[in-house]
């Protein structure tokens, strides 16, 4: 019986951590960045690509970011010829696929900022994926494109 207690404890700890380990082991956050806006603004947007190399869907239900009072998932939709932002309760990343949070579509709203981050400043960005946080660094940038897009030449 004395041997079973430590085994049960270890097993219990592993099971308690399994959602976090599963999310961290499967979700890959790439190309995260935050849009730099004038310092008078209280909100801004963040962008990231979420890859799911795993066999099960990933569900993003929210997150957090340094300097932000809260983070919301939003989509840009056309309503009566006007572009509108709509809050999303969740975003699903199918198995083996990726979802891009990018300008003009799905994006992350960073609301109630303590202050606007300066261009070049790096913020910690975390998404709640399958019930566990998955974090990355996001550089604050001016403009709308990622560095890769800014340096491409079109002929």
PLM features: what roles do these ranges have?
Residues 1-6:
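Positively charged n-region of N-terminal signal peptides that target proteins for export
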Residues 8-18:
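Bacterial N-terminal signal peptides
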Residues 18-24:
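Sec/Tat signal peptide C-region and signal peptidase I cleavage site
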Residues 24-155:
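Compact, glycine-rich, soluble single-domain proteins
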């Amino acid at each position: 019986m004395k041997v079973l207690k430590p085994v049960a404890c270890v097993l219990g700890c592993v099971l308690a951590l399994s959602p976090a380990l599963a999310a961290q082991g499967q979700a890959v956050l790439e190309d995260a960045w935050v849009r730099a806006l004038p310092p008078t603004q209280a909100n801004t947007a963040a962008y990231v690509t979420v890859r799911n190399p795993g066999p099960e869907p990933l569900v993003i239900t929210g997150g957090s970011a340094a300097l932000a009072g809260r983070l919301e998932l939003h989509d840009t939709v056309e309503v009566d010829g006007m572009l509108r932002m709509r809050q999303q309760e969740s975003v699903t990343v199918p198995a083996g696929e990726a979802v891009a949070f990018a300008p003009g579509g799905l994006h992350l709203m960073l609301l109630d900022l303590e202050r606007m981050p300066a261009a070049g400043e790096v913020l910690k960005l975390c998404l709640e994926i399958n019930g566990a946080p998955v974090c990355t660094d996001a550089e604050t940038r001016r403009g709308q494109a990622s560095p890769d897009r800014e340096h491409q030449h079109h002929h």
